Amino acid sequence: MVENQGNVEAHGKPKKVILSLSLKESSKINDSQNVSNVSSKEKCETEALLREENKENLSSDSIRQMIFGDEMAGFVDTGEKPPCSYATLIGLAILQSHNKQLTLSGIYTWIRNTFRYYLNHDGGWQNSIRHNLSLNKAFIKVEKPKGKTLKGHYWTIDPDHMQNFVSVRLHRSHSTDSNSKKRPSSKCHEIKPLTTREIPLARKRSRLNSFNSSTSTSGSSSNVAAEVSNDASQPSNQDSSLNSNIVKPPLPPSNVQSNSSSSENVPKPNAETQEDLPTIDAHESSLYENVNDSRLYEVPACRNMALNTGYSDADPGYLRTSFRSNSHNSLPYSANEEEDVLQADFLVSQQSSMVSSYVSSRDPHSMPYYRREPIPLRPSSRFYEYTRPTYGRTDTSCSAPGAFCSTQINSPSSYINYSKCAPSSPTLSLQKHREHVKSLLYVPDLTPSFDGSDPWNPSSQLLSEPLFDQHSFQSSLDDLMSVTCFRDSPELNHESSGYSSAPLMPSNRAFINDFSL
């Protein structure tokens, strides 16, 4: 029992000791937690105080470390433009000064000494510095002390905006990294531009499809054979190129019956030409459907033909082209041999026969008609002799532009006749013009003459009349000269024998003429 009690006691003592130790340890832990809480608060307060002290007293290295971080602390000037704004440069210059204030010239000198880029470039960066100082609210103007005689003022940073310059970080451009990380675009997303050859083919196909869907009637097989025979004499490769260039806009429905007579004038094929016709596939046969219909017209898309786009789709097409009157020779054009005919504002239905005759009558040895160069129309000049076109239009019964007119319309064509005797130079033409004007403004000579040869002189006609008594006029003149007022005249003093009836002097002749008039 004693042993057990001893054991119990022995076992009990350690329990008490353990409990006492645990209580002591818990009290120590609580004390350490309180100390740690107090130390964390003290650390926060000390850090805040240090920050405020650092704002007031900062060295150059600490300013670079706070403003730009590690990048600016190890900054090496390479002569390139620094990757920061002008406001940041101004704040950096002011914070590195001794009194945290600088003049405008001091800011300039610090930027030049720190960055070589601004030392070599004296351009518009100084204006940018002045604009930032005057417009940015973070900078304040401070007057200089009264003791100093220097003019001007200092610039400092507003304490409310000081944190903006402390927490700022350098933002470098990552253009090189972004360009290197760009993935190459896949080929499926690439857009291939349409070639110049594919664009007109798509337009032609869409136009033919819309035409086939719009037409409801089909022409007879004889009309198809008659239309195909017009181009039977041409090679097969030319036929394929012409068929792809067919333009077929429909005419108004009111012209269906009236234009049926014009379709009958199409020349019929011969038996020999029908045997040489090329075979037409099923796909191509759809292109030849309704080709000879009166509502359609066929014009080869040549370089020397152009449709006038001034009319709507419902109106009939108008063709403006120039044909050569004699197309049998393929020699260059000469003005002495041929004449140009300007055919404008003709209905295409009226010119279809002209085009077909022109195609059928072409010389097979000459170059193809669709490759022939267009005939240039010579510029107008005052030396060309034009024949006036027919201005009077006899047909006035058509109310609408697309209505069919039974009467024949006068041709507006004008034949250009080139003058063969044009002047060689402008100087010669000007000389001829001046001579012509002088001949119109010619004034006959009005000088007096007594021989009666000048018919325009009235004095000569007066003296030549038989009723005029010249002897009596001379005697009266002698009596007049004997008057006392003419005694001292030079003529009387010169001749002592008195006044003689000698021929008059030229001066006296003028006086007589005036007196007679």
Swiss-Prot record:
Highest taxon listed in the record's lineage: Eukaryota
The answer on whether this UniProt entry bears the keyword Kinase reads: no
Instruction: Cite the residue spans of the region called Disordered.
Output: 170-278
What are the record keywords, sorted?
Activator, DNA-binding, Meiosis, Nucleus, Transcription, Transcription regulation
What residue spans carry the Polar residues bias annotation?
230-246
Q: Which Pfam families match?
A: Forkhead
In this chain, composition skew of type Low complexity spans: 209-223, 254-270
Listed SMART domains: FH
Return the annotated DNA-binding positions: 81-172
* Compartments where located: Nucleus
A biological process (GO) of this protein is:
regulation of cell cycle switching, mitotic to meiotic cell cycle
Q: Which PANTHER family match?
A: CHECKPOINT SUPPRESSOR 1-LIKE, ISOFORM A-RELATED (PTHR45881), FORK HEAD PROTEIN HOMOLOG 2 (PTHR45881:SF1)
Its biological purpose: Functions as a meiosis-specific transcription factor. Binds to the 5'-GTAAAYA-3' consensus sequence of the promoter of the spo6 gene.
**What is this protein called in UniProt?**
Meiosis-specific transcription factor mei4
Q: Taxonomic classification, please?
A: Eukaryota, Fungi, Dikarya, Ascomycota, Taphrinomycotina
